[in-house]
Regions:
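Beta1-alpha1 glycine-rich phosphate/pyrophosphate-binding loop at the start
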Residues: 15-42, 71-83, 92-94, 121-130, ...
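Immediate flanking context of iron-sulfur cluster ligation sites
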Residues: 43-62, 86-112
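FAD-binding core/adjacent interface of flavoenzyme oxidoreductases
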Residues: 77, 102-105, 110-162, 223-299, ...
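FAD-site-proximal beta/loop scaffold in flavoenzymes
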Residues: 263-298, 382-456
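Long hydrophobic segments that form regular secondary structure
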Residues: 298-331, 397-403, 410-411, 429-430, ...
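A conserved FAD-binding loop/helix module that cradles the flavin
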Residues: 313, 452-477
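Active-site-proximal substrate-binding core of FAD-dependent oxidoreductases
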Residues: 336-339, 474-490
Length: 490
């Protein structure tokens, strides 16, 4: 029997990068956006998304895909977008990524997919991969194409996931698809981890995250929030409840430069500052914000650091109405670890960057009032291959400040102590030690994924690790079933 399918497929010629120039979605003017916390980039209009997608050169070896941690099938969904086959584009995109619309917003594409786009290397300007990725999945949400998970089989085994950040959420979704009963435990009152409390609204509006967590909840995943392992239930009790455990707590301990010997209250870690700002945006009452301690309004703010977290802090301070905002970084602009796009946005919004600058002393009476700094120059490369900053003699200066925010990265908390589980082995960096063949920790049936294994990293790496650990847990639980069957038969 012949079945006629009424499908209109637009035959689109790709490789249009020579005739169509690169265009980004429109961005709110800096004077306007610096006064609110709304997302600053608009979505592509349909025609513009199709045009920009058609610029893809459909490389035989797609370096954009190679350099994406998830190895997303980027050329395929670009071609489908150009052909107005958007639902198929979403299906391809979501087959390798649990949160494409989030990655499209916050991934540093200039260091990953777009930074390795072949047509960028030939001077034509990269394909706007991130913006198209965001457009595809935002459209999928609007059109109702994203449905709750309906496993083909429901299994009796349960998996406990400790941590509701990117790695934990990705692992939970993949395991739920396989039919396992999933419970996610998180210390905070909302699921999402740093997606909710660490990343400002102007980069990632919270509704984008909460619709993802609601989708998991609607799909049968149970969330237990305000839950502290070791207090509400012991780690051993969780192991008895579940057939497997995933630890995906992330890394929340802030690094500091040990200059605050006088414990000035107006020297604060980045995450504390950003969490307060995000909670205020969520209409929570935050006493330290209301008192002015974590509010940059009318203050001379100094942020120490050069990564994406530092950029989040300086741009938040601008929006809170800071008098001045300075960013101190010990290397130059070209050697900053964060996204260059975020640096440019911060410059447009009035942030004063002090490159090659190192704070050496915090000074004040009851509160910090001044920061003593020295200027640096880049010397020979160190063991990491980066040029080592060296102090220039007699270059000391004094900067006035009412608030210093230290954005120097994150370290793991002491989980064996927090969980009262001494058999959890850690590395010399404090991250959980795992067998990289299966991501299992030193405790049988307990796996780990995300930053708590690899150290502070990108959301996209957390998603990848969550997907990977889900596959290993599935294998582990299947082997246990087979093992138990053999024991019964014997």
């Amino acid at each position: 029997m012949h079945v006629s399918l009424n499908i209109s497929i637009k035959n689109v010629q790709m490789l249009k990068f020579t005739s169509i120039n690169k265009e980004n979605p429109s961005k709110v003017e800096s004077k306007v956006r610096s006064k609110n916390f709304d997302e600053i980039y608009a979505n592509f209009a349909k025609q513009k998304a199709e045009e920009q997608a058609s610029r893809c050169s459909q490389c035989g070896v797609p370096f954009c895909q190679v350099h994406c941690p998830l190895h997303n099938n980027i050329p395929d969904w670009l071609k489908l977008t150009a052909e107005n086959r958007l639902e198929e584009a979403y299906q391809v995109s979501s087959s390798t990524n649990n949160m494409p619309e989030i990655c499209g917003r916050i991934c540093p594409q200039d260091r990953l997919c777009e930074g390795n786009c072949v047509i960028e290397q030939s001077g034509h300007g990269t394909v706007t991969i991130g913006s198209i990725e965001k457009y595809i999945t935002d459209t999928a949400w609007d059109k109702g194409w994203i449905k709750k998970i309906k496993p083909t089989i429901n299994r009796d085994q349960t998996v406990g996931v400790i941590g509701a950040g990117p790695a934990g959420l990705a692992a939970a979704e993949e395991l739920r698809k396989l039919g396992y009963k999933i419970t996610i435990y998180d210390r905070y009152d909302r699921a999402g981890g740093l997606l909710i409390y660490g990343i400002p609204n102007f980069k990632l509006e919270k509704e984008i995250v909460t619709r993802r967590t609601k989708l998991l909840e609607d799909s049968g995943v149970e969330f237990k929030l305000n839950f502290n392992v070791g207090e509400d239930k012991t780690f051993d009790e969780l192991r008895k409840i579940h057939d497997a455990i995933v630890i995906a707590t992330g890394v929340y301990k802030s690094r500091d430069i040990n200059l605050n010997e006088q414990n000035f209250s107006n020297v604060v870690p980045a995450l504390k500052y950003l969490t307060a700002s995000n909670k205020v945006g969520l209409k929570d009452k935050v006493e330290e914000f209301d008192s002015g301690l974590l509010n940059a309004n009318n203050k001379n703010v100094i942020v120490v650091g050069g990564g994406d977290t530092a950029m989040d802090c300086v741009r938040t301070a601008v929006r809170q109405g800071a008098k001045t905002v300075k960013c101190l970084y010990r290397r130059d602009k070209n050697n900053m670890p964060g996204s260059q796009r975020e640096v440019e946005n911060a410059i447009e919004e009035g942030v004063d960057f002090n490159w090659l600058t190192l704070p050496t002393l915090y000074q004040g009476n009851d509160k910090l009032e001044e920061v003593k700094i020295v200027k640096m120059e880049l010397g020979s490369p160190d063991e990491s291959g980066r040029r080592k900053p060296e102090i220039i003699e007699n270059s000391e200066e004094i900067l006035k400040s009412d608030l210093v925010i230290e954005a120097l990265g994150f370290e793991p908390e002491n989980l064996p102590v927090m969980f009262n589980e001494s058999s959890l082995n850690v590395t010399k960096w404090g991250t959980l030690k795992v067998d990289y063949k299966n991501l299992m920790t030193s405790v049988d049936g307990v796996f780990a994924a995300g930053d708590i294994v690899r150290g502070a990293s990108l959301v996209v790496w957390g998603i990848k690790d969550g997907r990977d650990v889900a596959g290993h847990i599935h294998q582990f639980l299947n082997k246990n079933i087979e093992k138990n069957k053999r024991v019964v038969n014997e």
